[in-house]
Amino acid sequence: MKRTYQPSKRRRSSEHGFLKRMGTANGRKIISRRRRHGRKQLTRV
């Protein structure tokens, strides 16, 4: 059986990246919430 996590940089950025977040209203909410909270890393990419 294959393991569930098969890492890929391209897939990671296209699904969780900064540009993807900024592309939707809810994504922008996430970014602003993380900024307010003082996160060093806004997205995981």
Curated annotation (Swiss-Prot):
PANTHER family cross-referenced by the UniProt entry: LARGE RIBOSOMAL SUBUNIT PROTEIN BL34M, MITOCHONDRIAL RIBOSOMAL PROTEIN 34 FAMILY MEMBER
Organism annotation: Protochlamydia amoebophila (strain UWE25)
Keyword Ribonucleoprotein: yes
Cited PROSITE patterns: RIBOSOMAL_L34
Family: Belongs to the bacterial ribosomal protein bL34 family.
Protein name listed in UniProt: Large ribosomal subunit protein bL34
Lineage of producing organism: Bacteria, Pseudomonadati, Chlamydiota, Chlamydiia, Parachlamydiales
Gene Ontology cellular component terms for the protein in this record: ribonucleoprotein complex; ribosome
Molecular function terms from GO: structural constituent of ribosome
Region span, Disordered: 1-45
Keyword annotations from UniProtKB, A to Z: Ribonucleoprotein, Ribosomal protein
Transmembrane regions: none
InterPro entries referenced in this protein's UniProt entry, alphabetically: Ribosomal_bL34 (IPR000271), Ribosomal_bL34_CS (IPR020939)
Residue ranges, compositional bias (Basic residues): 1-13, 30-45
Short name of one Pfam family: Ribosomal_L34
Entry-linked NCBIfam families: rpmH_bact (TIGR01030)
